[in-house]
Design a protein with these regions (language model features):
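Active-site-proximal alpha-helix that buttresses catalytic centers in soluble enzyme cores
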Residues: 2-4, 22, 27, 31-89, ...
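Acidic, low-complexity terminal tails and accessory targeting/binding regions
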Residues: 2-22, 103-114, 156, 160-170, ...
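Short hydrophobic/aromatic-enriched beta-strand-loop microsegments
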Residues: 47, 90-98, 192-201
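Conserved histidine-centered catalytic loops in small-molecule metabolism enzymes
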Residues: 66-99, 208-228
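Short glycine-rich phosphate-binding loop at a beta-alpha junction
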Residues: 68-75, 161-166, 171-175
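Active-site signature of alpha/beta-hydrolase-fold catalytic machinery across serine-
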Residues: 85, 183-187
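Phosphate-handling substructures
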Residues: 86-146
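GST superfamily/GST-like fold recognition
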Residues: 178-182, 210
Length: 228
């Protein structure tokens, strides 16, 4: 992913030791009733299931061994509730950002594939989401535009402090949604398509980014780390 450094307000200190890196942990929110019922869930405010604490307990334990320096979270309820379970100590420092919301499915919110499968507009959207917008919903360009804006801003923030120091690396944690994670991974990892990533509720995917010039190149790494 290319990052525009002009007028960014952050100078790249190329004379500092070590390459610029980012470790980003992308977390999908826990399970909601609509996830279980396989309904399209975009901007609708629905909370997690009553067993959220038990569902997210393994991720909470895994994150206890992670050194994080920034936490971002979608402002939707299911993500805020997820954050409370997995990183309660971060609540006072988290940056809530509406750009991290799931795609807005408009009139298709709350509907299932079986309810929509005979709709010709829906069929066209499935085949070419870049060209078709759900009625009353968000276009592909609007969805990806806000996510590109978030990525650009996140990668430019705090740059000098993120040089690798004696092999120690801190992590950025982002709590968000399945469609968001699919898109950002397709932007950050060369050759990865939108549908190539499968992420279930309550799962974390770690991406390591290395900067070459004004480009960031990502690779997926094992999470949790071996031995954690």
């Amino acid at each position: 992913m290319a990052v525009n450094e002009e007028n960014a307000g952050n100078e790249v200190h190329r004379d500092q030791p070590g390459p610029l890196k980012r470790n980003i942990l992308w977390v999908r929110h826990g399970t909601t009733l609509w996830n279980v019922e396989k309904r399209y869930l975009g901007h609708t405010e629905i909370g997690l299931l009553p067993n959220a604490k038990e569902e997210l307990a393994p991720l909470h334990e895994q994150l206890s061994g992670v050194s994080w320096h920034e936490v971002y979270c979608s402002d939707l309820l299911r993500c805020r509730q997820t954050l409370e379970q997995i990183l309660p100590d971060a609540i006072g420092q988290v940056k809530f950002d509406s750009r991290l919301r799931e795609n807005d499915f408009g009139e298709w919110e709350g509907l299932t594939y079986d309810q929509l499968k005979d709709n010709p507009v829906y069929r066209s959207w499935i085949d070419a989401p870049q060209e078709v917008t759900p009625p009353g919903g968000e276009s592909w360009q609007e969805f990806t535009g806000r996510l590109d804006s978030f990525l650009q801003e996140m990668l430019l923030e705090g740059r000098p402090s993120m040089h690798v120091d004696e092999g120690r690396e801190s992590t950025i944690v982002v709590v968000t949604h399945g469609g968001v994670i699919r898109y950002v991974l397709s932007r950050l990892i060369p050759g990865l398509g939108f549908w190539d990533t499968h992420v279930v509720p309550g799962q974390a995917i770690q991406v390591q980014l290395d900067q070459q010039g004004n480009q960031w190149f990502g690779s997926r790494v094992t999470f949790p780390p071996i031995g954690l």
